């Protein structure tokens, strides 16, 4: 059963760093989740990406995700504006879970040379080999890719 929420909404502080001239965003409920931008709009767009990535990491690690603080009573320390950042997770999860990952492989030099001459695609060969070993058909792989991020 999928218990991960589709949507998160967290309060954030938006401020201007006088020394750099860049805008910053801090999430008081999520220590370490911060971002910046050259403009307010850039900082806010970056905040959505940072929040999505931070929460995805917490979900993936099995960490408890804190409830967002109520807006009432929140005040920025240095005159920061308080704003709400909302993220839609299903599409972000799918992007992260279907993202290609790099793997380092080691093979003899002569074999690498022959593979280059034959213009072989290492990634495709490795995927095909792993799917064959795990007895996963291309059709099943496509279905798995489509289902990622959907409720179970």
Kindly label every feature range from the protein language model.
Residues 31-41:
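A short, exposed loop/beta-hairpin motif centered on an aromatic-Gly-Thr core
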Residues 42-47:
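Acidic helix/loop or adjacent segment enriched in Glu/Asp that either coordinates divalent metal
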Residues 6, 18-20, 36:
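A contiguous binding-surface segment within folded domains or other stable secondary-structure elements
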Residues 14-29:
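Short aromatic-glycine-(Arg/Gly/Cys) micro-motifs in beta-strand/loop hairpins
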Residues 30-31, 129:
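Short, flexible N-terminal segments of the mature chain
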Residues 1-10, 48-106, 110-118, 124, ...:
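Short, charged, surface-exposed hinge/linker loops at domain edges
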Residues 27-30, 97-99:
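Short glycine-enriched loop/turn motifs at secondary-structure junctions
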């Amino acid at each position: 059963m999928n218990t991960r929420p589709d949507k998160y909404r967290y309060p954030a502080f938006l401020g201007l760093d006088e020394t750099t001239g860049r805008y910053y965003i801090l999430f008081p409920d999520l220590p370490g989740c911060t971002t910046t931008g050259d403009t307010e709009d850039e900082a806010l767009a970056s905040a959505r990406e940072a929040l999505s990535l931070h929460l995805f990491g917490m979900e993936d690690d099995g960490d408890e995700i804190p409830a967002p603080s109520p807006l009432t009573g929140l005040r920025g320390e240095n005159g920061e504006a308080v704003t709400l950042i909302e993220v839609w997770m299903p599409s972000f999860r799918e992007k992260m879970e279907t993202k290609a990952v790099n793997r380092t492989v080691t093979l003899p030099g002569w074999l690498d040379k022959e593979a280059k001459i034959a213009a072989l695609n290492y990634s495709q060969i490795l995927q095909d080999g792993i799917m064959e070993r795990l007895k996963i058909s291309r059709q099943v792989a496509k279905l798995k890719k489509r289902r990622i991020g959907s409720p179970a």
